Amino acid sequence: MALSTTPSQMSVALPTRIDGSSRSMIKVQSISFTDKSWGPPLLRLDSKSRSLGVKKRSTICMSLQQSSKSKVLVTPLELEDPKETPLNLFRPKEPYTATIVSVERIVGPQAPGETCHIVIDHDGNVPYWEGQSYGVIPPGENPKKPGAPHNVRLYSIASTRYGDSFDGKTASLCVRRAIYYDPETGKEDPSKAGVCSNFLCNAKPGDKVKITGPSGKVMLLPEDDPKATHIMIATGTGVAPYRGYLRRMFMENVPNFKFDGLAWLFLGVANSDSLLYDEEFAGYRKDYPENFRYDKALSREEKNKKGGKMYVQDKIEEYSDEIFKLLDNGAHIYFCGLKGMMPGIQDTLKRVAEERGESWEQKLTQLRKNKQWHVEVY
């Protein structure tokens, strides 16, 4: 079943809903990630690929752009059973061969660069938890090691353990295409382009992809307290793990996880066209105003209070008193994105702490000791 990327009113059959009915029809405005009709069509499996067993589901809903108060019942619930975090089920020497389901550009024409949402079918063989990463081995030979494969590239998983089709068989990645421009000529140099990101963004439905993992425990979503506060800070594709958190909190009907706390997302990007999953997050804010807050920093469109560019650390400073009070009360705080985001954020937090008469070094030590501090930068 191919879903149109053009925004329109349509009905889609979803898996069993919370009310127990075997099929329900939910009307949504759009199935794509963006309202930008200029973009290329969403790539999906054709009937031939499905007949080969790439996708054997009569009902496929790759993503819901808008939140619905009627949550989707996910399967298989056995994915909730393991007590131990799934780690390194597949390693670089023996990766798992998965299949590309779809590739979709999810930024607008004025975004500096291209970012794609990529759905991968692992057929339930590479289970993972929210906040973990997959490794991807692009095809070809490592130029620095003739005869050897390329090095593994890690990507944070942008879906819950049930995937975008809610059946535990897929995982989604949020990938920015890495392109190199010569600083002297200003021209693109394809020889220095990111091998793995370009492979993924150029992939077609049915293409094979070698994956490793899952890996990582630092960004796992703590679920022992459903009333906990989670402060999530990201730049660009660093929003990937938070999409997984938020879908688990607000979109999926998971019997053993009924979130009733506060999730607060700070997202820093260049401009409005660079916002990732914006409509999805806006839907949560509309449906769950008491449980979800969403603040954006658009560096090329907004100014901070000093008249400079608005970065995510400026938003943190704007709400610093509230953030510090939440941290004092046990809130978890997460950082994901480029390494370059951390110095500015750390400087801001240190300055705010000093203004409050606190030692940031002591506070940070305590946050780490209490396992409230989660950082994954690249």
Swiss-Prot record:
The modification Phosphoserine is found at residue 197. It comes from the Eukaryota. It is an enzyme of class 1 (oxidoreductase). One of its GO terms (cellular component) is chloroplast. GO terms for biological process: photosynthesis. Residues 1-65 form a transit peptide. Its cofactor is FAD. It catalyses: 2 reduced [2Fe-2S]-[ferredoxin] + NADP(+) + H(+) = 2 oxidized [2Fe-2S]-[ferredoxin] + NADPH. PROSITE patterns: FAD_FR (PS51384). Residues 349-373 form a coiled coil. Its EC number is 1.18.1.2. It is found in: Plastid, Chloroplast. Belongs to the ferredoxin--NADP reductase type 1 family. This is Ferredoxin--NADP reductase, root isozyme 1, chloroplastic. It comes from Arabidopsis thaliana. The gene is RFNR1.
